[in-house]
């Protein structure tokens, strides 16, 4: 299908389009910034935004002086906000290499209340920072500056030597230097005496608990809760949650304000209102505060001898730019606090962790939590740090909601497939418009129409019959060879009468079911979906559209999207395309329909029989696994009567299966656990499945003297075929041994060292921290598990140094795991009950450990919290053995990869020699034919180099490969591809002919020519291999250009490789299409080539005819404009 955007695209091409859009948007941002700086007070916001227009995704990025100057201005600004001061130090000598002009006044001025002794220190270039502060403060700074990740210790409380005034020192590293922001501790503020994340987390404990307790399934509820908690935590006049949409425009999705302020809920604003450069900085600095937009900024003076410009991007004091200050002033906002919400990209990640190279998920800026105040407002760094952590917790929940949305998309696809099958049973095609459900139920739309045998059937909001006929004629004239069109703007797609359709019809998806018959789906303009909850203005109160103001932004956004609808999703186009194929191939006449219907019912019945047999086999296997499992598993029916009791639970309790079956479960648990189990049963029977619930179960007969068994259980609702809950299954962990150890901790009243240092193998791995987050305990079992001795971790920050995502003793899998560990530790300090969660980390030796973490607070004799204890419960021996086998397989794969890397490296050396020799030859006098041959050789060398760079075959297969776009001609590609099979074809006397027209061969295209060359060479070689001696291979190509908008042309390329003989074996073609698990080398080569073609929004077909067969390769490229 053709369209204003590709209807089917891989993850790699989606990322490429997104990257190109960001680059293009940055250019637009730069121009707006330059216009603002040049125009001053005469800057016309609305006109400027309208002139820039929407960013075109397929437009090649450009780099110009305006953009470069803009980015340098953003990154290398030399101004800070005056509420604090800044020093930059040489990393080796701790001497000042830059300082803000207000630093001397804040850090060295004597206080009248504090008598000064000795000379006052002088602040300037070359000053040793330690001379400015008291001895304990200087010592603390020196210790922190020698720390690996200095940000872990922020903030550091220091006192000035002359005035004894307290400051928070906030440190970060940049290339070649250390930047320290000094923020004064306000008189009303209780100074934070201990550094580290755990201290700041306490400030947000209530808000975190509230977020954690929210049920999933509502992004709106999550955002509303977040802004309410931030509103209460920070005290700002207005708190908003911004969400960035796919096209980078923003929307206020939640808001809380103090009475009397105009609400901005529902506001949409153009992408330019928050420039891409600012978004990049938000990804780096996740919290940004502006204290007073009217304050005069302080300059930063740097040593003139420095060979580089200092960047203040990481500084908490960095001054906002004038354009943003003007925007705030127009909103009557004096102060702001912004928190970035950074989430994972929506791509897959392998479940099996790698000990050496664990790939991190790509991150993206989902949105912002923005606080505004009508008066100057300062938030101390500890509270800002707590807000940052709260934003990270919020981001984790946003991730989960996005994943749930993706699951809903999958359900929609399944629903669509059901609808398609339902339509398949009808009298096509009229049944798809005359019955229910109909084609409007297939995808979200405002209207749909069927043009069939020169008659029109309409549903919902559609153009008139006259306009529908005009659209059909336009498609036949301008998109004659395409099977359909999808666009979010008929105006931009080039339909002449698009504006006459009005706002009700902007976007369209259309497909052909025959040469004259079509189906249409229509969407109204985006603004129709937008509702701003802002206050209505008085008719006489008119906004100045030239000012940057929310209402102006909203109007500018509506101006940009006034001819656009919501874009068509890929899965929606898949559903439309599926319906198109069904109608084109399955319903040629009513007789065929009847036959097909009978065949379908027959197939469905066969599937039911197969499904029952398969279900019986699966059920038998599941029963066997449950019976032999090494963990306790039990089940009850809807009345609470036991109907499942495996060998392990019988062994632990001393109650046999026969004795347990039929008993009410509540009679088998300890009295103290009855209410817990009763609540869990009720919730599970209502469909709410709880996890990590701890209770005690009675023991019987020979086990009775051992006392009750302590279990931590996950509940799973059992459902029948109609999804009704008919029982509950419990999968448990036995925590009896661990509970015994913890009870001993309580009984010995703090004298726990005998247990901590006891090498008894029955004692689980234990570690602990003090109340400030420094590691204070690390028992022998923990040392054995991690490979880290006690002295290596004691007195290190548990969060960041011991467990972290970067340079830590025990590396965690990702940032989400790090945040969750912080939540658990924080909750353990503030709550009554111990926390139990799943936990995983990499040991020093690279082993990935998965376990259950139990955290409980440590109390002194007076009941004061002095830290936390953490216990690990490891997986069973059988599970560890299975993981060990998996790791062995992974190591074998790594060895093979190393061998492959060695071969690739050895190939590169002679390849470099060949390329050098070619360049030497290019410098000599050559004729036209010699130069053509040399160019073909160069293209082949580039192809080989590109293949050697392909380190991850799985990424190619999954479609996660970025294409390298550039201009080329088909003549270059076909010549280089053909040259690679000439040796083989000459050896078999196979003649290769090219029947492509000269115009197509010489047309300039835009795409990844080397990948296209690689694909064609592979298919040509396969064709030659299966062509008999003396046979022929014919190459032909056609090119169709579709106009997308006013300046972009889409080039639909089709190449046919026709060869004589019986053709490619069927099993190889199955391997190419991925329908067989065992793939040969030839099959893998075909499959990879097809995946590369699909990255170009194309595909490969194989057509068999009498005495000959053809590869038909299609690809979507851009037609380069000269």
Curated annotation (Swiss-Prot):
Residues 618-688, 748-822 form the PAS domain. Pfam families: GAF (PF01590), HATPase_c (PF02518), HisKA (PF00512), PAS (PF00989), PAS_2 (PF08446), PHY (PF00360). Residues 1-11 have a biased composition (Polar residues). It is found in: Cytoplasm; Nucleus, Nucleoplasm; Nucleus speckle. Expressed in fruits, flowers, leaves, stems, seedlings and roots. Regulatory photoreceptor which exists in two forms that are reversibly interconvertible by light: the Pr form that absorbs maximally in the red region of the spectrum and the Pfr form that absorbs maximally in the far-red region. Photoconversion of Pr to Pfr induces an array of morphogenetic responses, whereas reconversion of Pfr to Pr cancels the induction of those responses. Pfr controls the expression of a number of nuclear genes including those encoding the small subunit of ribulose-bisphosphate carboxylase, chlorophyll A/B binding protein, protochlorophyllide reductase, rRNA, etc. PHYA association with FHY1 and FHY3 protect underphosphorylated PHYA from being recognized by the COP1/SPA complex. Homodimer. Interacts with NDPK2 and PKS4. Stabilized by interactions with PAPP5 and FYPP3 which are enhanced in the phosphorylated Pfr form. Interacts with COP1/SPA1 complex. Binds, via its photosensory domain, to PTAC12/HMR when photoactivated; this interaction stimulates its localization to photobodies. Interacts with FHY1, FHL and FHY3, especially upon far-red (FR) light illumination; when underphosphorylated. Forms PHYA/FHY1/HFR1 complex. Binds to PIF3/PAP3. This is Phytochrome A. It comes from Arabidopsis thaliana.
